[in-house]
Regions:
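Substrate-binding groove of N-acetylhexosamine-processing glycoside hydrolases
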Residues: 1-124
Length: 124
């Protein structure tokens, strides 16, 4: 059995934007929210192989990350996209995730958490 965690989709210490908009020093390429949300961990697998996937996982390698505030920004809101990949599987809907993430943004604000604004820009 396996937990799916491919580097090109699940390493959240990678940049969130291609232009690296004030994201500080990190490592690797970029993995935007939309790419995480669109991931189908079962794509191209037989039913038999699917049965061996017990979950998905994102990773945060911290050797280039200076503090917890930066970790929050690197995780949020992509962590919400990863949760949808696991929970909703093939029931995901772009219009639904936008609404859910607006609700989550209010929650992040109420908790005083830091998050990357890139997904939300122009959607208020």
């Amino acid at each position: 059995d396996v937990v799916m965690t491919p580097m090109t989709l699940c390493y959240f210490n990678f940049y969130q934007t291609e232009s690296r908009k004030g994201e500080g020093l990190h490592i690797g390429g970029h993995i935007p929210f939309e790419k995480v949300y669109a991931w189908n961990p079962y794509e191209g697998m037989s039913d038999e192989a699917r049965e061996h996937i017990i979950g998905v996982q994102c990773n945060m390698w911290s050797e280039y990350i200076k503090d917890m505030d930066t970790i929050e920004v690197m995780l949020l809101p992509r962590l919400g996209a990863m949760a949808e990949v696991q929970w909703a599987e093939d029931r995901r809907d772009e219009s639904t995730i936008r609404q859910k993430m607006e609700t989550m943004r209010k929650f992040y604000d109420a908790c005083g958490w830091n998050y990357a604004p890139y997904y939300f820009e122009g959607r208020q």
